[in-house]
UniProtKB/Swiss-Prot annotation:
Residues 18-438, 499-506, 578-610, 669-676 are extracellular. Keywords: Cell membrane, G-protein coupled receptor, Glycoprotein, Membrane, Receptor, Signal, Transducer, Transmembrane, Transmembrane helix. It comes from Caenorhabditis elegans. Component of a heterodimeric G-protein coupled receptor for GABA, formed by gbb-1 and gbb-2. Within the heterodimeric GABA receptor, only gbb-1 seems to bind agonists, while gbb-2 mediates coupling to G proteins. Ligand binding causes a conformation change that triggers signaling via guanine nucleotide-binding proteins (G proteins) and modulates the activity of down-stream effectors, such as adenylate cyclase. Its main location: membrane. The keyword RNA-binding does not apply. This is Gamma-aminobutyric acid type B receptor subunit 2.
Length: 842
């Protein structure tokens, strides 16, 4: 009994491992009862030799531990040739042998392991593979199909978890995947990977690209889909040759570099990267593969100084088996696999030394010791081991991170993170609200306020000196309208720059109405008043008739009222039919590396705004065209007091040009808020200020020069010059064949007609003067031009009557146009005191 207790104690010690400096508590004896152990290998070219590592492990089990005291493991090696038939024959040979093997270590090929594992469950014989990584042995029904099958090498469960931890470590939440449909070795673990990413880590699988060799031409299209969906992190589960094809296709689509991360399976080789592809050179392949990651099971543990099972440094054991077979990828798992079986065998021995397969499977599942490939631990027949994550850098793989499945720990190797920074999992969409620059808004608002202040000064002057002769003759009421309209347009500049940084969205909607109405009505008031004044000047100097009536300000206000009525009708209809609403409009995206900026602008939205804007533009356009026409027609008029000289015409031209430019820039630059606001504000402020200055600065100068307004001769001189300039425009050019006599005759005829017209007007003037004198109106008679004048002579009255009667002698109008006295001299009271100083009271 004590013998078996000692054996159990040794087994427990082996399972728990040995600490540094600990010596064996038993004395090993050579020989013992043989325990047959089946070993499946592949002994042919291209496959590594498994026996050196197994023999080393077997030697350490018997010489460096107290387990299996009194027993000796004997290997029964069978070559399966990596063929199903040979493998099954080897299995039957082992089953037929006596005694039967207590367990089987191996094999390496899936096509051999699968039927053997399915058969061994009927004999309850444990099979521990050192090289099987196929995902079918970790599926949901694998425990039922392969009850006694274990593998000491980490499978897809570990590599998938390592990939998930890797993705989660960098905070990537959007990934794309590529799987090889025609290879279950890669397709099955890929499905488990995507499920775990989505449900275990909250990572969105944007798109899974399926590739296979039968439809190899579709690889490019699948990658195009990934690129179109802005996938930056790509997990790939394909074989080596397909991996080269995928990377080559990605290279031609620009899916490489610092903005992309390719996570590939680990093949424990880099030869596939140094081969020339059909569509890529070696240099292109290296460029495409730069900084990609590989995820593969670790060949050995990194902490080489750790004492492992057998009370030996891990580094020493690794060097020992590497010297024996340096090209065997599985040498570490061969070593740990034999130790796993030895420890499980020692634990499965009962008190009566009877072997139990059930206890052995239970012992393997409960194993936990420090091995050459890390901590050896199993869960559901699966090894929970180490997984290396390596990065391709400078033509070689360098360690980047490690995942320990036994302790579920993920660790980045700090020294390898230099020179690389994790990219974003997608292009970041940054919504940037485009607001008018605060400095620009303040500057334009200040200019607008200065303009309003200037307009108020002009309004004060216009009101203060409204009875001044110069101000009174320039229609001060209309000038006040021009000032009111200018104040509205200046105010619209300030309202144009307000946004939701200052006001709420609800107030912004009302602001949409306010600035539209203010600008529209302000333009109509200012331009309409100037248009009315220009029309009156045009009517006076281009429509000289005998029965012409005076055009009073009331008629001009009627014109202005009609224009305002049209605006109000359109604006009110607009407000009811298509009201404004607050909207945020996206502008064209601006890509910047991993960031896409989406500019947004705040707008006053109206479903039918285009229609109403077109109506307003049409009305204003017609008004401006007519204004330009009238300004051109009155270009020769130069009466400062009556039509503000040529300044009104200049203002009309300025308003037209600035309005066209402002409208054009507002439409073209409506997506560039700063440029649009600055130009629109400039045009409004410039044109409005220029109009105010052209209309009122000459008045201010005249007030400074003549505060009393007692120089009527200067006012009358301008009017007479304008009349003469208009009525004495040269006749149309005549052919050079006309004789001098004909030209003189035509000139005399025209002179007679004009002199008759002047005489008639003079007679009418004096008739009115006599009526005023008869009524006792002395204020009018005290005017300077009237004090020294006398009533026209009786001869002149008779002459005037004769001028109204046509001559019948030769059926044509003959007129005696003489204003001379009996002695042939001009009467002193004809029709002005000074013929060179005409009156403005036409």
């Amino acid at each position: 009994m004590s013998r078996w207790l000692s054996l159990l104690l040794f087994a427990v010690q082996a399972v728990g491992g040995y600490e540094a400096g600990e010596e064996l508590s038993c004395k090993r004896r050579h020989g013992g009862i043989p325990l047959p152990l089946g070993v499946f290998t592949v002994q042919k070219e291209g496959f590594p030799d498994a026996l050196p590592a197994i023999r080393t492990a077997l030697s350490h089990v018997h010489s460096r531990s107290c387990i299996l005291q009194g027993y000796r493991l004997e290997m029964i090696v069978k070559d399966t040739h990596c063929k199903t038939s040979q493998g099954m024959k080897a299995l039957f040979d082992l089953i037929a042998s006596r005694p039967r093997p207590v367990a089987i270590l191996g094999g390496q090929c899936t096509e051999v392991n699968e039927p053997i594992a399915m058969a061994l469950k009927y004999w309850q014989i444990v099979q521990l593979s050192y090289a099987e990584t196929h995902a079918k042995f970790a599926s949901s029904d694998s425990h039922e199909l392969f009850t006694t099958f274990f593998r000491v090498v980490p499978g897809s469960r570990n590599t998938n978890m390592a990939k998930c931890k890797f993705v989660n470590h960098f905070g990537w939440k959007r990934v794309g995947t590529v799987k090889q449909n025609d290879q279950p070795r890669y397709a099955l673990p890929h499905e488990a990977l995507t499920t775990r990413l989505e449900h275990g880590f909250g990572v969105k699988i944007v798109h899974t690209a399926g590739v296979n060799w039968e439809q190899i031409e579709t690889v490019g299209g699948e990658l195009d889909e990934l690129k179109e969906r802005d996938v930056r992190i790509i997990l790939v589960d394909v074989d080596e040759e397909m991996a080269a094809t995928v990377l080559c296709a990605g290279y031609h689509r620009g899916m490489y570099g610092d903005n992309y991360v390719w996570i590939l399976p680990g093949y424990h080789s880099d030869k596939w990267l140094n081969q020339t592809h059909d569509n890529c050179t070696v240099e292109e392949m290296r460029e495409a593969a730069k900084n990609h990651f590989s995820v593969e099971f670790a060949l050995t543990r990194r902490d080489v100084d750790t004492k492992i099972v057998g009370n030996t440094r891990a580094g020493d054991v690794w060097n020992e088996i590497t010297q024996l077979d340096p090209n065997n990828t599985w040498r570490g798992y061969l070593y740990d696999g034999l130790w796993t079986l030895a420890i499980a065998l020692s634990h499965s021995m009962g008190d009566n030394a009877e072997f139990s397969h059930h206890k052995m499977m239970e012992a393997i599942d409960n194993s936990s010791f420090q091995g050459l490939t890390g901590k050896v631990k199993f869960a559901n027949n699966e090894r929970l081991g180490l997984v290396d994550i390596k990065q391709w850098s400078d033509g070689q793989y360098v360690p980047f991170a490690v995942y320990d499945g036994a302790d579920d720990e993920f660790k980045i190797i700090d020294s390898t993170t230099k020179g690389w920074s994790p990219p974003l999992d997608s292009t970041i969409t940054e919504r940037r609200r485009e607001h008018i620059s605060s400095i620009l808004f303040l500057a334009m608002s200040l200019l607008a306020l200065i303009g309003i202040f200037l307009a108020l000064i002009f309004l004060l002057i216009n009101f203060r000196y409204r009875n001044h002769r110069f101000i009174k003759m320039s229609s001060p009421n209309l000038n006040n309208i021009i000032i009111a309209g200018s104040i509205c347009t200046f105010a619209s500049v300030i309202m144009l720059g307000l946004d939701t940084r200052i006001v709420s969205p609800d107030v912004f909607v009302w602001l949409c109405y306010t600035k539209t109405w203010t600008l529209c009505i302000g333009f109509t008031l200012s331009f309409g008043a100037m248009f009315s004044k220009t029309w009156r000047v045009h009517s006076i100097f281009t429509n000289i008739r005998m029965d012409r009536k005076a055009i009073k300000d009331s008629k001009l206000f009627i014109i202005l009222g009609i224009l305002l009525f049209i605006d109000i009708c359109v604006l009110v209809t607009w407000a009811f039919v298509s009201p404004f609403s607050y909207t945020v409009t996206e502008l064209p995206h601006i890509p910047e590396d991993n960031i896409v900026i989406i500019p947004e602008v705040e707008k006053c939205n109206s479903s039918h705004s285009g229609v109403f804007q077109a109506v307003l533009y049409a009305v204003k356009g017609v008004l401006m065209i007519l204004g330009c026409f009238l300004a051109w027609e009155t270009r020769h008029v130069n009466v400062p007091a009556l039509n503000d000289s040529k300044y009104i015409g200049t203002s009309v031209y300025c308003c037209v040009v600035m309005s066209v430019l402002g409208l054009s820039t507002s439409v073209i630059l409506q997506e560039r808020v700063n440029e649009m606001f600055s130009l629109a504000s400039f045009f409004v402020i410039f044109s409005t200020t220029l109009t105010l200055c052209l209309v009122f600065v000459p008045k201010v100068i005249e007030l400074a020069r003549n505060p009393v307004g007692n120089e009527p001769r200067a006012y009358r001189r301008g009017l007479m010059k304008s009349v003469v300039a208009k009525t004495s425009q040269p006749m149309s050019p005549q052919p050079r064949s006309d004789s001098s006599g004909d030209l003189i005759g035509k000139a005399e005829s025209e002179n007679k007609l004009r002199r008759r017209y002047l005489h008639q007007k003079s007679t009418q003037l004096w008739d009115l003067v006599e009526k005023l004198r008869a009524q006792g109106d002395t204020r009018f008679l005290q005017q300077e031009w009237c004090l020294s004048s006398a009533s026209p002579s009786s001869q002149e009255r008779e002459t005037s009557l004769l001028l109204r009667q046509p001559s019948s002698s030769n059926n044509r109008e003959e007129t005696s146009l003489t204003a001379a006295g009996p002695n042939g001299e001009r009467s002193s009271d004809w029709p002005w005191v000074d013929p060179d100083e005409p009156s403005t009271k036409l």
